[in-house]
Each structure stands twice: as structure tokens, then as C-alpha cells.
Design a protein with these regions (language model features):
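Gly/Ser-rich, acidic/histidine-flanked active-site/gating loops
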Residues: 6-20, 33-35, 81, 87, ...
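Short helix-loop capping/hinge segments that flank enzyme active sites or metal/cofactor-binding pockets
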Residues: 78-99, 303-374, 436-443
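Short, surface-exposed loop/helix-turn segments at secondary-structure junctions
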Residues: 370, 401-419
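Structural helix-boundary/capping segments
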Residues: 2-6, 18-22, 41-52, 176, ...
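Short, Asp-centered acidic motifs that coordinate Mg2+ and/or phosphate
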Residues: 124, 175-176, 221, 391
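Alpha-helical tetratricopeptide repeat
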Residues: 2-3, 20, 160, 474-564
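Gly/Ser-rich catalytic/binding loops embedded in alpha/beta enzyme cores
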Residues: 2-175, 380, 384
């Protein structure tokens, strides 16, 4: 084991011997007190930290001494951090969130590359955190370790899979934390726990020494409360930027994604636009696009994964297809990595994770080549959209988290929206930053910024430049009397109904059925849509379908019987 590693399991933590003589007396006293309190916590002699449940392993890996001049000073002196349970640490077994995994694997012979880098830059690792089993959950609930308590909203789940890392940061147990992000594993808990998150471009930070879920989607990311610490960790882990900024930055808002939210624009889009307007320089006027339609037009190989749709719904269909490709790719690669272990050990898994693992190990790889082609096309298309100075702005999450211990499952509508948002960066391999935006209905909300693959330091710099202005606008937005949120799905379904009615009047029965079906897909609780489609079916002599629609209309609204 590295001489810098000191385990809390033995209770033999020593004072920081690396404090150099030239440090001021006050600084020495502060550091000594920090070290003393940390040792007491590690030995279990002090009361547990608030919001306990974040950690699964308590340990301490201390950094080497600050090098003497002329060597560069460490970037992260005196900062503490934690890592998820899928990071290897020499002499310890990485549990991957599951006791059967821990039981069937040996202690690591090396420490993860990213952890070593952070130690070298002066940070101290104080523990390993709870995560959803095998990196597959999204709620933060773990059958074996329990659910870490969300400091930002204790009555709800913290989000996963890197729940413990987000909770440790939000509860101020550490200054920052590492985790892996495959399909939102860091971005989801960051949003639910109200902390900052950075998911770097895929392949930019070494994943050596981490347990893989899906190797072409996995990235090592980090969480922090302070944007300066978020940026400093980036300076430590990311390669040096190739060149400086070549022009003013431009925010590109994904309007169709924000239309899927039930949060007022005054608390999301307007906050960011107003913040950027107050900045003296550095940003062009923002642009607004329909990202779904852009994907539909610029990722040709995605068409085989799209459901049949009207022209009006093409964008939504493309977004759903993008997240389908992401999830299929994850299943294929998880199966390649872990099928033998799953079939041999037959691990005990929580219900949600068990379902996802079974989907992965039972996956058939008929169209694998197409998945990778879509990924390549989407990365190129997003790069073409954003170029060197563009930043895509989109929601992080689709809504509020589930209640703790409610035994509810996420609705398919919630999952579809959530995965659509996270797939934009995940499948393109682009970098994404998540920034808290205060609260809505007593739950944390956030917004995300995506830059092209490789533009990581550019994006971190932009977040630093915007952050203070965003905080001021959050305060102003919280004081506004906001109108009720319009459900845009209802608006769209009514528009489709009217298009169906117009087609019916023109005796275009098949076209009318297509529009009514689109309205039903968006809102399947409106009896009128079924009645109208039944009338069109009758005109075509499709009596069985007409009868089925009439029956459904009656189930939804008994009063409608007089119309049938």
C-alpha cells in the first residue's frame, strides 16, 4: 500500500506530518484541529456526522507534502474528498454497491488513477461512498446499504447511482466527491441534492482503477458546492486546454426540452438569460432551437430506432430514440463486462436494479454496429451545432424525486424524459455541467450546460463566469408571483385533435385517425379523442376499432354515452 494511505479501520491515524515549518502558527492550529476531529470521527469516538448514510468505507488517504520551490504548488491543498464504491483503493475491496460483488473479489493492488492524481495535488480522501448496485440505479436506494439521506430535501430520495457522493457534498462532509457517470449517475443526484456537478468528455479523464458499467459511456465526474472548487478539481484532472477562447460564447437553449417540464420558465430559462444579460462581456445573444428536430435531421442512422410519428412529433420521437440507443449500448457493454459474474454468482439485487441487470444479460446484439454509428453521428452533429463557442442549455431532470421509502417506481413518462435529457451528453460523449437553481415546490431544481467533446475547460470557465450572476437571478425569481405552468402536452394534443377534425371534414379519414392517435398518445384520458377516432374508423368500415374506442370513451366519461 502507498505510504500515503492510512486506514481508519485500524484507528491508527497520525497527525499531518507533512505540515511544513514555514506555515503560520494560526494555520498550524487550524490544520491540527481539523486533523484531530477527523481522527476522532475515523475512530468512531465522536458522534456521527449529520446526514449519515453517505459512507460505506471510512478511511484516510493523505497527500504527500507540498513540494518546495521551484516546483509548482499543489492545486488542492487541505481539501477533503470522497469517492464512490466503484473506485479501487490499494488494500481495499471495491464493493460496487453490492455485498456479493465484494465477497467474490479481492482487494485492489493499485489505487484508481484519478484518486492518485488528486492526492498528488494535495487533497485528502476520507472515505468511499454508497452507490446503487453495479451502477445501475437512478433513485439512490440500496437494498443492502440503505438510502443516504438527502440533505437538501430529507423526505425524498437522493438520486443515483452515486447517491453517497452527492449526499457527502451536500451535507458538507467533504469539499468535493468523485463518482462515475454513465447514464446520469452523477447528474441525477446532483440535481436532487442541490449541488454542482461536472461530467467531463468521455475518455478525457482516465477510468483506470474504476469498475466499469458501460465502458464507452462511463466517465469520471465530480461534485462540489463551490464553483471554484469544481473548477480547481478540473484543473487537476483535465489535460491542459489546447488553446484559448476564440470568440464570444453563445448559449443555445433547447426549447423543446424545457417544454417537457412543469416548472415555470421564470425559474429556469429566464434566470439564465437574465444572468447573461448582466455580464459586461463574453457572451453573444442567446439562440433557441428544437434539439429533437435537429437530431432528427442530422443523425440519419437514428431513424431505425424511431417510432412512427407525425411531422409535429418528429423531435420527440428522435429524443426518445436517442435515449433508446444509449440504454441499448449500456446493456450490451454491461453484458460484455459482467454476464459471467451475474450468471455464476446470481447476486441478490434490489428490484429496480435486478430488472435492469436482467435486461442487460438477456440483451441480444443484432444491431450493435448501428448503435455505435448513431453515437459517432450524434457527436459530429453536436460538434457542428456548438462548434468552439456554443453551449447547449437544457434541463437536468424531468421532475421531482420520489418520496423516501415509498416503494413507488418511477413512471415511464418520467424515465423517458429523464433519459432523453441525460442522453444528449452521454451518447455524444460531450462534457456537461449541472448548476442548482434554487427550489420549486420545496424541491431542488437545476439546469445543465453542454459543450462539445473536448471543450471541458472552456465549459468550466463559462460556469465560473456566470455563477454569481445566476445566483442573483435565482433570488429575484424566487420573489416573483408566477402564473400556473401550462401543460404543453395538453396544448399539443388539442392542436392534434383540431388537425384531426379538419381532416375529418375533408373526408381524409386515415389522416384524421393519425392525428387523433397522436393526441391520444399525449393525453390518453380525454374521452373526446377516442370518440372522434371512433367516428373516423366507422367511415372506413373498421368497426372493431371503432367499438374499442367507444368502450374506452365510456370508461373515461359516462356522460358521453349520449354522444355515441
Amino acid at each position: 500500500m502507498d505510504s500515503s494511505a492510512r486506514s481508519g479501520a485500524t484507528g491508527s491515524s497520525n497527525p499531518r506530518a507533512w505540515i511544513v515549518a514555514g506555515v503560520a502558527v494560526a494555520g498550524v492550529l487550524v490544520l491540527a484541529e481539523v486533523a484531530r476531529r477527523r481522527r476522532r470521527w475515523l475512530r468512531g469516538k465522536s458522534s456521527p456526522p449529520p446526514y449519515s448514510g453517505a459512507f460505506c468505507d471510512r478511511l484516510e488517504l493523505a497527500p504527500p507534502p507540498q513540494p518546495p520551490p521551484p516546483a509548482a504548488r499543489q492545486l488542492l491543498p487541505d481539501l477533503t474528498f470522497a469517492v464512490s464504491d466503484n473506485f479501487e483503493i490499494e488494500g481495499y475491496v471495491a464493493g460496487f454497491g453490492n455485498p456479493d460483488w465484494k465477497r467474490t473479489h479481492k482487494a485492489a493492488s493499485h489505487t484508481a488513477a484519478a484518486v492518485k492524481t488528486l492526492l498528488k495535488q494535495g487533497a485528502t480522501c476520507v472515505g468511499r461512498t454508497v452507490m446503487d448496485e453495479l451502477g445501475f440505479g437512478v433513485t439512490g436506494e440500496n437494498l443492502h446499504c440503505g438510502t443516504p439521506i438527502n440533505p437538501a430535501s430529507p423526505s425524498v430520495v437522493p438520486g443515483g447511482s452515486c447517491s453517497g457522493s452527492a449526499v457527502a457534498v451536500s451535507a458538507q462532509l467533504v469539499e468535493f466527491a468523485l463518482g462515475t457517470d454513465t447514464t446520469g449517475d452523477l447528474r441525477i443526484p446532483a440535481s436532487f441534492c442541490g449541488v454542482l456537478c461536472f461530467r467531463p468528455s468521455q475518455g478525457v479523464v482516465s477510468t483506470l482503477g474504476t469498475l466499469p458499467n458501460s465502458h464507452s459511456l462511463d466517465t469520471i465526474g465530480w461534485l462540489a458546492r463551490d464553483p471554484h472548487i469544481l473548477s480547481r478539481v478540473g484543473d487537476a484532472l483535465l489535460p491542459a486546454a489546447a488553446c484559448g477562447l476564440k470568440g464570444k460564447r453563445q448559449l443555445v437553449f433547447a426549447d423543446d426540452c424545457f417544454e417537457l417540464l412543469k416548472i415555470p420558465n421564470q425559474k429556469t430559462v429566464d434566470v439564465i438569460e437574465n444572468a447573461v444579460r448582466t455580464l459586461p462581456y463574453g457572451f453573444q445573444p442567446p439562440k433557441h432551437i428544437n434539439i429533437g428536430q435537429y437530431i432528427s435531421s442530422n443523425v440519419p442512422s437514428l431513424k431505425e430506432f424511431c417510432e412512427p410519428s407525425t411531422k409535429l412529433q418528429e423531435g420527440k420521437s428522435a429524443l426518445k430514440a436517442l435515449c433508446t440507443v444509449m440504454l441499448l449500448l449500456q446493456r450490451y457493454e454491461f453484458k460484455a463486462n459482467h454476464e459471467d459474474w451475474v450468471n455464476t454468482v446470481k447476486p441478490k439485487l434490489g428490484l429496480e436494479v435486478s430488472t435492469r441487470v436482467l435486461q442487460a444479460v438477456n440483451f441480444t446484439d443484432d444491431n450493435i454496429k448501428s448503435l455505435y454509428i448513431v453515437r459517432t453521428e450524434w457527436r459530429a452533429a453536436l460538434k457542428n451545432l456548438l462548434k468552439d463557442t456554443g453551449i447547449l442549455v437544457l434541463p437536468t431532470m424531468a421532475g421531482h424525486p420520489l418520496k423516501r421509502n415509498s416503494k413507488q417506481r418511477l413512471s415511464s413518462e418520467f424515465e423517458d424524459k429523464m433519459y432523453a435529457f441525460v442522453s444528449i451528453a452521454a451518447l455524444s460523449g460531450s462534457c456537461q455541467a449541472t448548476v442548482p437553481l434554487g427550489n420549486h415546490n420545496d424541491h431542488p431544481i437545476s439546469i445543465s450546460f453542454v459543450a462539445a467533446h473536448g471543450s471541458d475547460k472552456f465549459l468550466l470557465r463559462a460556469i465560473l463566469d456566470m455563477y454569481s450572476a445566476i445566483q442573483k437571478q435565482i433570488v429575484l425569481a424566487s420573489k416573483l408571483a408566477l402564473p400556473p405552468v401550462i401543460d404543453r402536452d395538453v396544448d399539443t394534443s388539442e392542436l392534434l385533435k383540431e388537425k384531426g377534425n379538419n381532416s375529418f371534414k375533408r373526408k381524409q379519414w386515415s389522416k384524421a385517425i393519425e392525428f387523433y392517435s397522436g393526441a391520444i398518445k399525449l393525453n390518453d384520458t380525454n374521452a373526446t379523442y377516442y370518440c372522434n377516432r371512433a367516428a373516423a374508423y366507422l367511415e372506413l368500415g373498421r368497426f372493431k376499432q371503432a367499438e374499442a374506442d367507444c368502450d374506452q370513451a365510456l370508461l373515461l366519461d359516462k356522460k358521453i354515452s349520449g354522444m355515441l
